[in-house]
Amino acid sequence: IKGFTTGVQHIGIPTNDINKTIEFYEALGFNIAYRTVNGAEEVAFLQLHNLMIETYQNYQTKMEYGAIDHIAIDVKNIEDLFDEVKESGIFTMLDNQVKGLPFWENGVKFFTIEGPNKEKIEFCEKL
């Protein structure tokens, strides 16, 4: 797996109020790197140096500690990585295929596994 990874891509934080979340992180020095609507969810990627936060409004946020939804690892050759992870039998797959979203300039492809503490680890490739 290590040969496919290039670093942390983003940390996903759901929100009930995306504007309030953006204002908070802007006060910390973050800038809006990308903003869009995906279905009914508003999505914003907020950047501070090499740290990227993906926040998305879903109106189901529990508003309690442990609010981070997932950690995304930046990868290359996602289809090959997916096959390797699935065939290993070591990991609990949360996705049965590589998915796509129309984010950024050319979209992204991703899939998610479950960590030993029920954390979600997303492997994501910007296209």
Task: Put a short name on every predicted segment.
Residues 42-44, 69, 107-111:
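Short beta-strand micro-motifs in enzyme catalytic cores
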Residues 17-18, 75-79:
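Helix N-cap motif at beta-to-alpha junctions
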